[in-house]
Regions:
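Helical segment within the ABC ATPase nucleotide-binding domain
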Residues: 183-196
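H-loop/switch region of ABC-family ATPase nucleotide-binding domains
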Residues: 204-205
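Pre-NBD coupling/linker segments of ABC/ABC-like ATPases
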Residues: 2-42, 237-244
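ABC ATPase nucleotide-binding domain signature region
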Residues: 5-7, 11-14, 53-58, 62-118
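Conserved catalytic segment of ABC-fold P-loop ATPases
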Residues: 212-219
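Conserved N-terminal flank of the Walker A/P-loop in ABC nucleotide-binding domains
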Residues: 40, 47, 55-56
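ABC-family P-loop ATPase nucleotide-binding domains
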Residues: 38-40, 90, 95-156, 160-168, ...
Length: 246
């Protein structure tokens, strides 16, 4: 059964930037004689969250409050500095559609690459099904993504990222990156993914969206949980949610 457990989790960033988690950077620093202690900033501060099947959790807060960073911790992109993280179930992190894509590769090869990164076997049937969803000309599969317009590129990346259901779905804002002629179809596909997932966590500035779609809202500020607002459903519709009243 899908489950997320975070207990007293902290994440410290090197002060010179989050990208410097790399081993290469550390080795170069040592060769340059910069082996002293690195100054850090605490991005996630002592956070505990428990979620089981049926949970729809919204992450709210101002820019820099830690919403996106917390999603990346849960997805395994960043290692926690301290605390305990336990994830049970298949995780789909929709945090950046272009992550892992190579614009110099042809479209079909990019689809296969992205599927492998997500742990899926890119069979011909699966690639063809993904391509059919994009509604793009069949011949474009053999063109490098660099030749695609931004709208066409997003169609390919969106169709690939959302091709399979997941136990745990992580969303950094509600996806609205596809062109206008494709948006309704993409919205329905995303809603289906959300309904199929056992646990959904979405970070957003849109309070109305969170209140409409979530069972609880976790309010963050400076990497800390300020409070958690519980909500409940009064409708058979999966998104017919409203706040509990005392």
């Amino acid at each position: 059964m899908a489950r997320i457990s975070l207990r007293d989790v902290c994440l410290d960033y090197p002060l010179y930037g989050a990208y410097d988690f790399s081993l290469k950077r550390r080795l170069l620093g040592r060769l340059a004689g910069q082996s002293g202690p690195t100054r850090t900033i605490r991005a996630i501060d002592n956070i505990s969250i428990e979620a089981c099947a049926g949970a729809r959790i919204g992450l709210a807060g101002p820019n820099g409050s830690g919403k996106s960073t917390l999603l990346r911790l849960i997805a395994g992109v960043y290692p926690a500095t301290s605390g305990h993280i336990e994830i049970t179930g298949n995780v789909m992190p929709l945090l950046g559609l272009n992550a892992g894509a190579n614009l110099d590769f042809v479209a079909a090869d990019n689809i296969s690459l992205l599927l492998r990164i997500s742990g899926r076997k890119p069979t011909r049937a699966i690639v063809d099904e993904i391509w059919a969803f994009t509604e793009l000309d069949e011949r474009m599969q053999r063109l490098p993504l660099r030749m695609f317009s931004s709208g066409m590129l997003m169609r390919v990346l969106f169709a690939t990222a959302t091709a399979f259901p997941a136990d745990i779905l992580l969303l950094d804002e509600w996806l609205s990156v596809v062109d206008e002629n494709f948006s309704a179809k993409a919205e329905q596909r995303l809603l289906k993914l959300v309904s199929q997932a056992a646990i959904v966590i979405i970070a957003s500035h849109d309070q109305e969206l969170l209140r409409r779609t979530c069972t609880s809202i976790v309010n963050l500020d400076r990497g800390r949980i300020i409070n958690t607002v519980s909500l409940e459903t009064h409708s058979a519709h999966p998104f017919g949610l409203r706040e509990k009243r005392a």
